[in-house]
Swiss-Prot record:
This is Large ribosomal subunit protein bL36c. Its main location: plastid. GO terms for biological process: translation. Transmembrane segments: none annotated. Belongs to the bacterial ribosomal protein bL36 family. GO terms for molecular function: structural constituent of ribosome. The gene is rpl36. PROSITE patterns: RIBOSOMAL_L36. Keywords: Chloroplast, Plastid, Ribonucleoprotein, Ribosomal protein. It comes from Phaeodactylum tricornutum (strain CCAP 1055/1). It is found in: Plastid, Chloroplast. Signal peptide: none annotated. The keyword Flavoprotein does not apply. SUPFAM superfamilies: Ribosomal protein L36.
Length: 37
C-alpha cells in the first residue's frame, strides 16, 4: 500500500474507488495499491 498525495491509475486493471471518504486505487497487481494521505 502506497500513501500518496495524488493517486493515479498505473495500469488498465487499476480502479479508483472511494472508501470511508478516502480515495483509493485497487488492482490485481498488489504493487499498485494506493491510498490518498
Amino acid at each position: 500500500m502506497k500513501v500518496r498525495p495524488s493517486v493515479k491509475k498505473m495500469c488498465d486493471k487499476c480502479r479508483v474507488i472511494k472508501r470511508h471518504g478516502k480515495i483509493m486505487v485497487i488492482c490485481s497487481n498488489p504493487k499498485h495499491k494506493q491510498r490518498q494521505g
